[in-house]
Amino acid sequence: MEDERIIVRPAIPADVVFADEIIREMESSAIARGSGISKRSAASVIEKIDAGKAIVAVTENGEWVGFSYIETWDNGKFVSNSGLIVSPQHRNQGVASEIKDCIFNLSRSKYPSAKIFSITSGLAIMKMNTRLGFEPVTYAEVAREPRFWDACKSCVNYDVLQSKNRCNCLCTAMLFDPQLN
């Protein structure tokens, strides 16, 4: 239903039932947009939910609507806002913006002194990031931890990243520095 209320909130353990649906939608959405995205596993989504590092959107009837999660890097110096996805039938209703605001606030509350970054190829995410105070940066200004870059291996554009020595790719890196904001 179009007028059904959507609730955006921190994920709870019961939300692990959405993990398969979340990863399927992430992959199909990336294919439909023709953009690269690092593939996630259901286990990684469950891990984020169980660790209190995820935001979920659901209808009041318990239908999955959207998701995003955070991850820390370089010993907590950086936090990434990642995996923002909204189910196709609930897009263009402001859900992504609400999820983005919540995941940003979760990052700030859990890791107040960490720099927050987002790597995206989507204009909508770039606009949301800009509204929150993120600025475009080079890849050299975000996490350097090899584990972060290993996650890019499943992206269709990984060869571009490698050929550029992890200095740039087709995605835009955006950074929020709490010292400047």
Name each model feature, range by range:
Residues F18-I22, S44, E98, C102:
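Alpha-helical elements of Rossmann-like donor-binding domains used by nucleotide-donor carbohydrate transfer enzymes
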Residues E21, N105, K127:
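Surface-exposed charge patches
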Residues A14-D15, A19, S28-G36, N168-T172, ...:
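Amide-forming acyltransferase catalytic core, primarily the GNAT-like/NAT-type
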Residues V86, N92-S107:
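Conserved acetyl-CoA-binding loop-helix of GNAT-fold acetyltransferases
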